[in-house]
Regions:
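Short, glycine/acidic-rich hinge or "gate" loops at secondary-structure transitions
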Residues: 1-9
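Catalytic micro-motifs at enzyme active sites that drive phosphoryl/nucleotidyl and oxygen chemistry
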Residues: 46
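Helix-loop elements that line ligand-binding/catalytic pockets
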Residues: 49
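Sequence/fold signature of self-assembling virion shell proteins
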Residues: 16-43, 53-58, 64-166
Length: 166
């Protein structure tokens, strides 16, 4: 971790300089803003400035954007226009894992794109201790007692795993 927020315009590179995993100007979910963020992802570089094969994998939205995201990704033509142009997002299959709805985003307009960064090098979930259960009875009241215990940790190794806007 580099000490920055998950989405930042100034994540430090190990060899100097910075990179961004956030749109320069915050934008609502739209065909154009998705295309802009996908271009930013596909032009990503490693810590030495070399282009890497980073591609969008899935679109993550809050409930307020669920229907708009579905329209944008599933229409055969451009969204909300009289143009007869194809929907490049659908035609190219930009999001092979589709749209993911997250009920817990703190902003109703939040949306993010998860990338194909190597497993274990992006967003990580570590299960430190597996779920265990214990059961007992309270002697004086005869009430059943139950205890569930689990330990885990979440983090990020490389912020290039997720791009988005605020």
């Amino acid at each position: 971790a580099d000490g920055k927020t998950l989405l930042a315009t100034d994540h430090p590179n190990t060899s100097g300089g910075t990179f961004s995993n956030k749109l320069a100007v915050a934008a609502d979910l739209s065909e154009a803003s998705i295309e802009d963020l996908c271009i930013q992802i596909m032009q990503a570089t490693d810590d030495r400035g070399n282009l890497i094969n980073l591609m969008p994998k899935s679109l993550h939205v809050a409930p307020a954007n669920w229907f708009e995201a579905t329209r944008i990704l599933n229409t055969t033509l451009q969204v909300g226009t009289a143009n007869n142009d194809i929907s490049a997002i659908r035609h190219l299959g930009i999001f092979p894992d589709g749209v993911k709805l997250n009920h817990y985003f703190t902003s109703p307009k939040a949306w993010f794109v998860r990338t194909n960064i190597s497993k274990g090098k992006g967003l990580i979930f570590l299960q430190r201790e597996a779920m265990s259960f214990e059961r007992d009875n309270d002697f004086s009241t005869k009430n059943a007692l139950a205890l569930g215990y689990e330990r885990y940790s979440c983090g990020i190794v490389d912020p290039r795993a997720i791009y988005g806007t605020e």
